Amino acid sequence: MRIGILGGTFDPIHYGHIRPAIEVKEALGLDKVLLMPNHIPPHKHQPNLSTAQRLKMVADVCAELAGFELCDIEANRDTPSYTVVTLEQLSTQYPNAELFFIMGMDSFIHLQSWHKWQQIFGFANLVLCQRPGWHLSNEHPMQQVLMERSAAIDTLKNPPQKHYPIHGRIFTVDITPQDISSTQIRSALAIGKIPTDALMPVTLNYIQKQQLYLS
């Protein structure tokens, strides 16, 4: 089994998260994608909404998307949501699965600042989402890591080896640019605008019913 993992504050979850995840799932032929709300994000400010509210929004989205599941593993920890700790737990939970941690290229270029970042490759593959035509400069310190671990998507045409999941590779997927951000959505909602083009109806319905993000 091949499992994608997309973490985020999801404050709120929107099409800028969902559409790239769908594109990655299709490009790599993943069996499912776990959407994982951060509880205590180490690289961001604390979310506006509670963890319970963000879990609810993500659960609602997953209920409407085939092959997507809510992962609450970080929500159940009262420690910072370090990726390496999460992936170690997931590799124990899915011992025969190949894990694919999905991230933007904007996050990858700062990977060296992450907690025990080199150990991440022992538990999962990375999937880098990038805009078509964008490339990491040869001078960037992460370029060497990318070159050493880069793998072609075509290699996934072979079925995964049961009991011997392969980790440590980096796959790059060109995704359709999404000019959407949670900050923009929160700002719009605060002044009474309804960003119907950015949110799934089920998410917008929950936000309106709970009167969230109002100034």
Curated annotation (Swiss-Prot):
A molecular function (GO) term: ATP binding
List the GO biological process terms: NAD biosynthetic process
Does this UniProt record's set of keywords contain Nucleotide-binding?
yes
Q: In which pathway does it act?
A: Cofactor biosynthesis; NAD(+) biosynthesis; deamido-NAD(+) from nicotinate D-ribonucleotide: step 1/1
Q: Which UniProt keywords apply?
A: ATP-binding, NAD, Nucleotide-binding, Nucleotidyltransferase, Pyridine nucleotide biosynthesis, Transferase
The record lists the catalysed reaction(s) as: nicotinate beta-D-ribonucleotide + ATP + H(+) = deamido-NAD(+) + diphosphate
The record, for Pfam families, names: CTP_transf_like
EC numbers for this chain: 2.7.7.18
Any keyword Disulfide bond? no
Superkingdom classification of source: Bacteria
Q: What does this protein do?
A: Catalyzes the reversible adenylation of nicotinate mononucleotide (NaMN) to nicotinic acid adenine dinucleotide (NaAD).
Q: Which PANTHER family match?
A: NICOTINATE-NUCLEOTIDE ADENYLYLTRANSFERASE-RELATED, PHOSPHOPANTETHEINE ADENYLYLTRANSFERASE
Q: What family is it from?
A: Belongs to the NadD family.
- Protein name per the record: Probable nicotinate-nucleotide adenylyltransferase
Species per Swiss-Prot/TrEMBL record: Shewanella sp. (strain W3-18-1)
